[in-house]
């Protein structure tokens, strides 16, 4: 499964304060792992500090998370990401959180909008960024189809 999500994020060790009354990691921390763990993936997509300093960013328009296997205190969760589809203004990507045994704990999908921060509106990505993302998408697609039904989509 991991091979179909080629961008590895930052691992997180589940601590007692992350657990709820059910003695497993509370759902809010799954989002936290996906959010904090995607920085390398965003860099790989071209959303570097320089790009942001040039006045461009991305806003999340929609997210969907599925909880498949609980993580408990002392376990480590590692996020992995891949592109699903792009168009001139939008990016659809997915992620998984995997435990140390290789079990998928959670699956997420996200739709991002490319934003011109000078006007704070969705804008088309520059041609070089689209070309880079298309190359990345081709590489990710070469790993095979993902094993989850997608709930989000872009045209």
Please give the residue ranges for each predicted region.
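Hot-dog-fold acyl-thioester-processing enzymes
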Residues: 2-61, 116-155
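A structural microfeature
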Residues: 106-108, 124
């Amino acid at each position: 499964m991991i091979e179909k999500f080629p961008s590895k994020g930052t691992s997180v060790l589940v601590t007692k304060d992350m657990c709820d009354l059910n003695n497993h990691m509370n759902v809010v921390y799954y989002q936290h792992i996906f959010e904090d763990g995607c920085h390398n993936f965003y860099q790989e997509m071209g959303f570097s500090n320089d790009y942001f300093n040039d006045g461009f960013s991305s806003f999340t328009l929609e997210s969907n998370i599925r909880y498949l296997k609980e993580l408990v205190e002392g376990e480590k969760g590692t996020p992995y990401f891949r592109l699903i589809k792009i168009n001139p203004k939008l990016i659809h990507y997915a992620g998984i959180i995997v435990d140390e045994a290789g079990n998928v704990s959670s699956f997420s999908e996200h739709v991002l909008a490319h934003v011109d921060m000078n006007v704070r509106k969705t804008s088309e990505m520059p041609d070089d960024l689209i070309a880079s993302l298309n190359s990345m998408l081709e590489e990710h697609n070469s790993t095979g189809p993902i094993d989850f039904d997608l709930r989000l989509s872009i045209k």
